[in-house]
Amino acid sequence: MPTFPQSFPMNGGDGPHSYIHNSSYQKVAIDGVKERTSEAILEKLDLEFLNRNSEENILRIVDFGCSIGPNTFDVVQNIIDTVKQKRLKENKTYIGAPLEFQVCFNDQPNNDFNTLFRTQPFFSRKEYFSVGVPGSFHGRVLPKNSLHIGHTSYTLHWLSNVPQHVCDKKSPALNKSYIQCNNLVDEVTKAYKIQFRKDFGGFLEARAEELVSGGLMILSGQCLPDGIPKALTWQGVVIDMIGDCLMDLAKLGITSKEKIELFSLPTYIPHISEFKANIEQNENFNVETMEEISHPMDYMPLTNDFITSMFRAILNTIIEEHFGEGVVNELFSRLAKRLDKYPIDFKRCKKYVNYFIVLKRK
C-alpha cells in the first residue's frame, strides 16, 4: 500500500512555481464573491453576541485552508472592513472594550506558514492579531464556542486521505487507469463519494462545535453539474493528461507503472445535488444563502503556460512525495508539450458549478 503524507499543501516559497505566484485563478473566484461575502455579513451577522462578555470584546475570524499568498489576506481584510462598516451603520453603543479582531490562518501542518506570515501586508498587522493554526480542517482546530466568522474557499474538494480501496491491488475499486476520480469507473467513484461524505461531514461537525450561536460559516468552491463526469471538464482533462505523462515516464524507466497504478489524488469534486444534500443533512446550521454562480474566467481561454503553472503549484508536493523529486520537472515539461500538441477545447468542455453558501450556527 502506498503511504501518502498526512497533508497536501500547495507549493510553498515564493519561487516561480510557488502557489503565491500561481493562484490567480483562485483569486479571481474569491474576488467574484467579495460583494456577496460583505452582503452576507451585513445582513446575517448579529453583533449582539459580541457584547455578552464585556471583558473579552473580540471577534475571531478563521480562514480554513488558507495556504499562502495574498488571497487569504484579501479575504480576511474584506471581512474585517465589513464588520466595521456594520457597526458604524447600526450606530449602537457597545459596552466594554473596543472591538478587537483575531484572525486564525488554518492549514495543514506542513503548509508554508513562514512564507505566509513573511508576506503579510504590514498595515494588516495593526488591524488584527494573527495566529497560525496548523491542523486538518476535517476535524476541530479551535476550542468550542470560540469562532464568530469562518471562511473557506476552493478547499473542500481536498480529502483527508485517498480512499483506502482505491489504492488496494485486491480491490475492485483500484484506480489503476487514472490518477483521479473522473467519474468514469463506478467502483472508484463510489469509494471517493463515501470518503467525501465522511470528510465534509467531519468539517461541518467541527465547525458546529467551534462556532458561537449566531456565528457564520462562509463557503465557496466548485461542484460538478448533475450528470456530468469530471472527465468532461477542462480540469479533468488536464489531470488525465498528467496521468498520461506519468505513463510516458514509466516507459522511459523514470518511474514505474506500479507506482502510477497505486497513485490517486486525494481530491473529489461532488455533484451539486450531492453537495447540497450533505449540507442539508446537518442540523446544526440554518442555510442563509445557497447560490450557484459562474467562475469569472469560465469563458476565457487559458494559456497552456498558465494551466501548467497552476497545476504544478497545486500538485507539486504530493507528486514529489510519491514519485520522488526527480520526476516533477520532467512531468510538467511533458504536460506543457502535450497541451501544445492537444490544446484544450474550452468551448466543448463542461464547466464546473461554482457555489457561494452562507451557514448560520443555530
Curated annotation (Swiss-Prot):
Q: Which UniProt keywords apply?
A: Magnesium, Metal-binding, Methyltransferase, S-adenosyl-L-methionine, Transferase
Q: Name one Pfam family in it.
A: Methyltransf_7
| Chloroplast listed as a keyword | no
Enzyme's top EC category: transferase
For whether the record's keyword set contains ATP-binding, the answer is: no
| Residues the entry annotates as binding S-adenosyl-L-homocysteine | 19, 66, 71, 107, 136-137
Protein EC: 2.1.1.-
Q: Tell me, how does this one assemble?
A: Homodimer.
Its GO biological process terms?
methylation
Cofactor(s) recorded for this entry are:
Mg(2+)
Q: State the protein's name.
A: Probable S-adenosylmethionine-dependent methyltransferase At5g37970
UniProt-recorded Gene Ontology molecular function terms = metal ion binding; methyltransferase activity
The note on the cofactor says: Binds 1 Mg(2+) ion per subunit.
Annotated InterPro entries: MeTrfase_7, MeTrfase_capping, SAM-dependent_MTases_sf
Binding positions for Mg(2+) per the UniProt entry: 175, 261, 263
User: SUPFAM superfamilies attached here?
Assistant: S-adenosyl-L-methionine-dependent methyltransferases
> Which protein family is named in the record?
Belongs to the methyltransferase superfamily. Type-7 methyltransferase family.
